[in-house]
Amino acid sequence: QPQNHTSDLYIWLQQNGYKIEQEVLAEEGTQLYEILYVTHGHMDPFSEIEAEIGVTESRYKDKLFVKHLKKLINQRKMILNGIDIESANVVNTAKYQKALTDEAILEEILWRFM
């Protein structure tokens, strides 16, 4: 299982004829791991942020789901804190806007689970 950029794996699986049947989060120390049960099949398209959050109902029922959301929110905050928007170039401005949008989506989902 990849530990970074898991959304890339999700999107690759979807685009190459695989279906994510189940997602489980596992925790070891401070690290969260994503465990996937994958079969051949069709999945409806999903966005990059949906791929990071999880694309199956099992993810939303996982006891570590809130912790997973908080981790994703913290990653966005680190991006936002690392970019000086006043002096940012076009690429950094786009990264900033994406992180801001993603953070808002994640916060809204987290609010529903708190």
Where are these regions (language model features)?
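Class I S-adenosyl-L-methionine
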Residues: 1-114
